[in-house]
């Protein structure tokens, strides 16, 4: 299969939008605040008249990734598919805010490489909270179900979460407010001339 280029380039779309397409990839334990921070960043960007779109790992499991479970292979495929969706959206000039556990360092690195090959900015943001904090929040009751044996292969309970070693930003979400975390992400986008 051969790639088919159109007449309109990414530069044309970015010029039209007045921003650069990019991906902000929020990673962390379930209950760390990834989606909550992404929602706050989205509100700030849209308030500043910047086009962005949230790609939430849970939401994708209702459609595109509906057929995937939580085994290591399925998690890897979940991250790969999500990365492809983010790459396509970023190529349109949109700022993509992706939030998913993505527990394995190697899979996140593959997504980073995918964006590098497409010459698209990719920023990994680690929403860092201790397991005890994430488990005490448990907004979806997933830790409770995992501890009761109702969910297998759950990150933090049955499988490890591999924290980033070279991410662009670490948010200490156990000690900082959602708003403070969102401000740091927006500032990172400004510093990198995305917005």
Role assignments for model-derived ranges:
Residues 1-23:
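Extreme N-terminal, non-catalytic leader segments
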Residues 26:
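Hydrophobic anchor at the beta1->P-loop junction of P-loop NTPases
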Residues 30:
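The conserved Walker
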Residues 34:
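Conserved lysine of the Walker
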Residues 63-74, 84-146, 153:
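ATP-dependent NMP and nucleoside kinases share a basic, alpha-helical "lid"
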């Amino acid at each position: 299969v051969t790639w088919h280029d159109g007449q309109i380039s990414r530069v044309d779309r970015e010029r039209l939008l007045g921003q650069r397409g990019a991906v902000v990839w929020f990673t962390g334990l379930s209950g760390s605040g990834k989606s909550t921070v992404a929602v706050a960043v989205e509100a700030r960007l849209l308030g500043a008249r910047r086009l962005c779109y949230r790609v939430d790992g849970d939401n994708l499991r209702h459609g595109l990734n509906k057929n995937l479970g939580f085994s290591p292979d399925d998690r890897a495929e979940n991250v790969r598919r999500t990365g492809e969706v983010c790459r396509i959206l970023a190529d349109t000039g949109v700022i993509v805010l992706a939030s998913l556990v993505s527990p394995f360092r190697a899979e996140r690195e593959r997504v980073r490489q995918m964006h590098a090959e497409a010459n698209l900015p990719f920023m990994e943001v680690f929403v860092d909270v201790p397991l005890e904090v994430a488990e005490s929040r448990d907004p979806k009751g997933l830790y409770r179900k995992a501890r009761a044996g109702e969910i297998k292969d759950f990150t933090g309970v049955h499988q490890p979460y591999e924290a980033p070693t070279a991410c662009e930003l670490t948010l200490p979400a156990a000690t900082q407010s959602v708003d403070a975390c969102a401000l740091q992400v927006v500032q990172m986008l400004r510093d990198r001339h995305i917005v």
